[in-house]
């Protein structure tokens, strides 16, 4: 399925909006720090590496999504600390 750049940007914007909303409404998300996220990020990175070594395209896509979620979450957490 092919999407235009505009559609991709809108989808990514919705993704970031959801992260922002979760940081406000979800107690678990709200208490996360860079330090507390690190073990999960390491696990997701290993899962991505495993999928890459197996050349499992479906799993690679899934794990890339998980890693992207972590990167965006770190950005959200760090931005909060920069603006305080």
Can you describe what each PLM-predicted range is?
Residues 1-60:
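Extended low-complexity intrinsically disordered regions
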Residues 65-69:
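Glycine-centered tight-turn and secondary-structure capping sites
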Residues 79-84:
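Conserved small/polar residues in nucleotide/adenosyl-binding loops
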